[in-house]
Amino acid sequence: MGRIIRVTGPLVVADDMKGAKMYEVVRVGEMGLIGEIIRLEGDKAVIQVYEETAGIRPGEPVEGTGASLSVELGPGLLTAMYDGIQRPLEVLRELSGDFIARGLTAPALPRDKKWHFTPKVKVGDKVVGGDILGVVPETGIIEHRVLVPPWVEGEIVEIVEEGDYTIEEVIAKVKKPNGEIEELKMYHRWPVRVKRPYKRKLPPEVPLITGQRTIDTFFSQAKGGTAAIPGPFGSGKTVTQHQLAKWSDAQVVVYIGCGERGNEMTDVLEEFPKLKDPKTGKPLMERTVLIANTSNMPVAAREASIYTGITIAEYFRDMGYDVALMADSTSRWAEALREISGRLEEMPGEEGYPAYLASKIAEFYERAGRVITLGSDERIGSVSVIGAVSPPGGDFSEPVVQNTLRVVKVFWALDADLARRRHFPAINWLRSYSLYIDSIQDWWHKNVDPEWRAMRDRAMELLQKEAELQEIVRIVGPDALPDREKAVLIVARMLREDYLQQDAFDEVDTYCPPKKQVTMMRVILNFYERTMEAVDRGVPVDEIAKLPVREKIGRMKFEPEIEKVAALIDETNAQFEELFKKYGA
């Protein structure tokens, strides 16, 4: 027990805190607000409070809980919506109405709900941390694998029969090597600032297929990879994040709304239950965990929400699932660090951010990865992290963007210019990059098309050539260009408008499978080759631009059947042959 001696915003200083530990959770004041000790000096503790501190005064008590900030991991996480410190918002609403009262807590996982548990081990089996004790069908899409906590190993001396149990009931007893008996329930707690252990990391060789053509073809994300989406306001960060949350081929999605508008979380809540998972036909919400920490919630909890989210993601990874984590936006998290650092009177670094900003960002992103999980069987799981960054005024030289780019391997640069021209996703193909292309090309060649890399590089060259020609056109106008270069402009425009542009609100175009992406690319590149051949044979460029097949190529993105898209190649060839006859070429 201690007493408050000073309150500054979300920061409270208390004395008489003998026996307190770093990162211990405490209850502050008469209301019992939740806080966390972030600095100890003698018997004084500096506490960051995760709730509004108005009305708290010196002299009020501070009570330690003896535990660090932890999350509950077990059945009931999926479809749930939490705040930054894993309080279930639906339950809090029942307790206090639409606005959360202060000092409220509720268990993160439902205590009274019964889950159907099927054991996978028997008495006498030797188990280690990470082994699967049994399974629970948590939603129609995901089977929840109940794991032995990482710190437990020994022999099973008792395991329950198949049946319905709450998460508080003991389902197994393990005799440890020292003879102690450890009781296991369906859930366990894990401190959020500690990364969950695994056997070893694997190289990122499998792409995370998102169904967004720009991303999959040009700037691919790998399973277990890290990506950043920086962009100015209104350039489509949140919609891109939503698209990735909807369509990426991860089995579980953790969506952290960190310091963004409340309406954006409402969007997710309204859309996801209606949307069907393309693989199973069940609502997408059944594979999603939402962490809502909107801009009008206390600043300190933003910092916690990022860690809460990644810990939940690591837990599903340990079951052997591929998890995608969306953090929207890491800038707001960095601003929370800046505010708390300022209250602590630390030396500011660049633009007032704390000097340790770079290491905090790196610490978060390095928890991503594709790994062989703990346990006797060789399960492979992955956490792919995609962080949005909102630099003020779209300035990419700002510290959060620069420190993020040092650690992530994929950079999707959103461009306000493209967004103004209604080119979505507004990913600038000249500034963006992916360092995973070399490691994932084998997957594409084996599973989709052996010519994928060659076609991708060819298309990229065309887009870069177009950018060079655009500068000349601005100075001397398009008529001064030779025919071959005019042809490049025509085909590059087709690439931009018919391939890169995608409609997130169209039923067909919102998700483009890899096979269709490659076929569309082949149609456009075939048109390019025939165009060059025609120009060399003396066919005027204006005639090529008027070919009726161009309109069909423009509409192919809305065509669900891949065969019909592939048929455009023959149609293109036939129309060019007619041109050759007409011009006697």
Curated annotation (Swiss-Prot):
Record text on subunit structure and interactions: Has multiple subunits with at least A(3), B(3), C, D, E, F, H, I and proteolipid K(x).
PROSITE patterns: ATPASE_ALPHA_BETA
Binding-site list for ATP: 231-238
UniProt function note: Component of the A-type ATP synthase that produces ATP from ADP in the presence of a proton gradient across the membrane. The A chain is the catalytic subunit.
Principal cellular location given in the protein's record: membrane
Entry keyword set: ATP synthesis, ATP-binding, Cell membrane, Hydrogen ion transport, Ion transport, Membrane, Nucleotide-binding, Translocase, Transport
Pfam family, one: ATP-synt_ab
Protein topology in the membrane: Peripheral membrane protein
UniProt-recorded name of the protein: A-type ATP synthase subunit A
Compartments, as annotated in UniProt: Cell membrane
One cellular component term from this protein's GO annotations in UniProt: plasma membrane
Naturally occurring in which organism (per UniProt): Thermococcus onnurineus (strain NA1)
EC number per UniProt: 7.1.2.2
InterPro entries according to UniProt: AAA+_ATPase, ATP-synt_VA_C, ATP-synth_a_Xtn, ATP_synth_asu-like_sf, ATP_synth_asu_arc, ATPase_a/bsu_AS, ATPase_F1/V1/A1_a/bsu_N, ATPase_F1/V1/A1_a/bsu_N_sf
GO biological process, one term: proton motive force-driven plasma membrane ATP synthesis
Gene3D superfamilies noted in UniProt: 2.40.30.20, 2.40.50.100, Bovine Mitochondrial F1-atpase, Atp Synthase Beta Chain, Chain D, domain 3, P-loop containing nucleotide triphosphate hydrolases
CDD domains with a match to the protein in the record: ATP-synt_V_A-type_alpha_C, ATP-synt_V_A-type_alpha_N, V_A-ATPase_A
Origin organism lineage: Archaea, Methanobacteriati, Methanobacteriota, Thermococci, Thermococcales
Catalytic activity: ATP + H2O + 4 H(+)(in) = ADP + phosphate + 5 H(+)(out)
NCBIfam families: ATP_syn_A_arch (TIGR01043), PRK04192.1 (NF003220)
Recorded GO MF terms: ATP binding; ATP hydrolysis activity; proton-transporting ATP synthase activity, rotational mechanism; proton-transporting ATPase activity, rotational mechanism
